[in-house]
């Protein structure tokens, strides 16, 4: 028999359960420390900024939107995420297959050095059919 087999031993379950509870308590304590440190950091560094004070005081953002000089430089928020068909996208069009001249050459150790032109042509044909490239 191999050494990798495991059997259900009823006594071990209790030990594992205690370890799991101890781990969970440690995890909870660490999370509480993390959340406490975040609140301390806010009160020290970020609390001095005007924006942070405005958020804490519950100041309404209508004052910013009513300022015409400030909002005139920005387009309306609904125009930011709309699909603009008149712009040219410089990326690849995935519906079109790449041209054979753009495809990378295989490394030299993959290809035999003494290939006849017929064998090279056959390999390129097979690669093109695998990649579904129309030559």
From Swiss-Prot:
Alphabetized UniProt keyword annotations: Activator, Cytoplasm, Nonsense-mediated mRNA decay, Nucleus, Transcription, Transcription regulation
Cellular component annotations (GO), alphabetically ordered: nucleus; P-body
Subcellular location: Nucleus; Cytoplasm, P-body
Metal-binding keyword on record: no
Main subcellular localisation: nucleus
Gene Ontology BP, a term: nuclear-transcribed mRNA catabolic process, nonsense-mediated decay
InterPro entries listed in its UniProt record: PNRC-like_rgn, PNRC1/2
Superkingdom of origin organism: Eukaryota
Region of interest called Disordered, as start-end residue ranges on this chain: 75-103
Compositional bias annotation for Polar residues: 75-89
Extent of motif SH3-binding: 95-101
Function: Involved in nonsense-mediated mRNA decay (NMD) by acting as a bridge between the mRNA decapping complex and the NMD machinery. May act by targeting the NMD machinery to the P-body and recruiting the decapping machinery to aberrant mRNAs. Required for upf1/rent1 localization to the P-body. Also acts as a nuclear receptor coactivator.
PANTHER family listed in its UniProt record: PROLINE-RICH NUCLEAR RECEPTOR COACTIVATOR (PTHR15405)
Family label: Belongs to the PNRC family. PNRC2 subfamily.
Protein name: Proline-rich nuclear receptor coactivator 2 B
High-level lineage: Eukaryota, Metazoa, Chordata, Craniata, Vertebrata
